[in-house]
Amino acid sequence: MKVKFLLAVFLIVLVVTDHCHALFGLIPSLIGGLVSAFKGRRKRQMEARFEPQNRNYRKRELDLEKLFANMPDY
């Protein structure tokens, strides 16, 4: 009777520790996911403030500089 009781307690402790280990392993990934979600939302909010035609202004400006640099002088 004692052996069955000890075996049952051991299995319960084993299952509980396994679940706790899984939970504590999950917490850092949840925190990382929340942080990246907030950063992504902040980025989307900043992009929404700019007009669509001005969003890629710097890229177009660099393309024009490259185009003018390659044009021959007349």
Curated annotation (Swiss-Prot):
Coiled coil: none annotated. One of its GO terms (cellular component) is other organism cell membrane. It is found in: Secreted; Target cell membrane. One of its GO terms (biological process) is defense response to bacterium. Keywords: Amidation, Antibiotic, Antimicrobial, Antiviral protein, Cleavage on pair of basic residues, Membrane, Secreted, Signal, Target cell membrane, Target membrane, Transmembrane. Residues 1-22 form the signal peptide. Its main location: secreted. Residues 45-74 form a propeptide. The modification Lysine amide is found at residue 39. Expressed by the venom gland. Belongs to the non-disulfide-bridged peptide (NDBP) superfamily. Short antimicrobial peptide (group 4) family. Mucroporin: cationic host defense peptide that have antibacterial activity by breaking membranes. Is more effective on Gram-positive than on Gram-negative bacteria. Minimum inhibitory concentrations (MIC) are the following: MIC=>100 ug/ml against E.coli AB94012, MIC=>100 ug/ml against P.aeruginosa AB93066, MIC=25 ug/ml against B.thuringiensis AB92037, MIC=50 ug/ml against B.subtilis AB91021, MIC=25 ug/ml against S.aureus AB94004, and MIC=25 ug/ml against the methicillin-resistant coagulase-negative Staphylococcus. Its synthetic analog mucroporin-M1 is more effective. Mutant mucroporin-M1: can inhibit Gram-positive bacteria at low concentrations and antibiotic-resistant pathogens. Minimum inhibitory concentrations (MIC) are the following: MIC=12.5 ug/ml against E.coli AB94012, MIC=100 ug/ml against P.aeruginosa AB93066, MIC=25 ug/ml against B.thuringiensis AB92037, MIC=25 ug/ml against B.subtilis AB91021, MIC=5 ug/ml against S.aureus AB94004, and MIC=5 ug/ml against the methicillin-resistant coagulase-negative Staphylococcus. This is Mucroporin. The lineage of its organism: Eukaryota, Metazoa, Ecdysozoa, Arthropoda, Chelicerata.
